[in-house]
Amino acid sequence: MADRTEQILTPSQLNTLARDLLEGSFPLVWVEAELGNVTRPASGHLYFTLKDARAQIRCAMFKPKSTWLKFQPREGLRVLARGRLTLYEARGDYQLVLDHMEEAGEGALRRAFEELRARLAAEGVFDAERKQPLPAHVRRLAVITSPSGAAVRDVLSVLARRFPLLEVDILPSLVQGDSAAAQITSLLQRADASGRYDVILITRGGGSLEDLWAFNDERLARAIAAAHTPVVSAVGHETDVSLSDFAADVRAPTPSVAAELLVPDQRELVARVRRAQARLSQLQQHTLGQAMQHADRLALRLRARSPQARLQLLQRRQEDAARHLRARMQHILERLQARVQRAQAGVQSHSPQRHLAPLQQRLRAAHPQAAMQRRLQQDHLHLRGLVRSLEAVSPLATVARGYAIVTRQADGSVVRSAAELTQGDRLRAQLADGSVTVVVDTSETG
């Protein structure tokens, strides 16, 4: 009879303890084996066994994970699976619940790839700081690839269509097999050392991980990272990733895309050149028009400031001044002539002849000779007095005695005092036999 002091478990309790023990002891395991008893019910989950020659274990891969498998599971296929051990408590069966599964050969390569990638990344081989930009204009390109593969045909076709002037050297190499990595590395190092190329393109078409394994070589990755010439890697399809992609300065998803990255489209270049020419022509016309306008303004200013222009201006001013002077002189002369005529008329009105005739008539009327003689003498004396009085006030008499009538040349006004004058005034002096023009040097009063 059982000892009642020991713990008594139910089947569910025992299975729970066993499940906890399994899950705690085996958090994550990798198993390589063959598939057996593969079933996929309507739920989308995948059930099978992993087996070898001596044992097997039940496995489950639920729909969220099984949907992403890259192969079709089938009987006898050797796989590499990763999962957690657990126990299905309802039946007491222990099983492996998988979250990843791949074909066995590719899985080993994948693990080696991930380990090498992590190590090179830790060393800084893939650091973005050391990557070089592609040159703006690629003139000479080296293409390391198989000379008979689809990749080289795609690259050359795109280059010929987009930019046929590019110089392209095909450096033929194996792209698959044991010696491919060493050959690609050697060609890369020689092309880089030559200094002949602006860019080096390493490329091949798609394939399995094993087919592309040459591009996961450590020596090749380090050679790409150390190259002084920018390196473009275009290996496989868009979903394929290799260490050469990580090490290269630029990674292209396909060979065709790599060719498009390296050269511009000649049609786009022609269009850009034409647009640039049009802008340059407009700029030239605008600049030339502004320059011509500026030159015209300078020419006008130069002509305005030239000695000939200034001489013409002085000549015009001199002619204007001469016309003005002649007009003023004519005006002054006319005024003087009018004054002389008025003076002459006054003299004539007091002429002795005019007074003598009436006197003679009066004398003839008066027969007495003596009385007539006295009266004649008296009248003659009176007449002479009148003549002297007229001559004393006559301007002509004043001028005849050596004096001059002085007027301003500017307006013809008569100068009556030295105080009216300033240095530099231009005057006209009317003399008995003509006139002279004088300039005031100094003036004194008193």
Swiss-Prot record:
Looking up InterPro entries in the UniProt record yields:
Exonuc_VII_L, Exonuc_VII_lsu_C, OB-fold_nuc-bd_dom
Q: List the disulfide bonds.
A: none
Q: What catalytic activity does the UniProt entry give for this protein?
A: Exonucleolytic cleavage in either 5'- to 3'- or 3'- to 5'-direction to yield nucleoside 5'-phosphates
EC number per UniProt: 3.1.11.6
> Where does this protein reside within or beyond the cell?
Cytoplasm
* Keywords, in A-Z order: Cytoplasm, Exonuclease, Hydrolase, Nuclease
Nuclease found in the keyword field: yes
Main location per UniProt?
A: cytoplasm
In terms of Pfam families, this protein maps to: Exonuc_VII_L, tRNA_anti_2
Extract one GO molecular function annotation from the record: nucleic acid binding
Q: Any one Gene Ontology biological process term?
A: DNA catabolic process
EC category:
hydrolase
According to its UniProt entry, the function of this protein is described as: Bidirectionally degrades single-stranded DNA into large acid-insoluble oligonucleotides, which are then degraded further into small acid-soluble oligonucleotides.
Q: Which family does it belong to?
A: Belongs to the XseA family.
Q: What is this protein called?
A: Exodeoxyribonuclease 7 large subunit
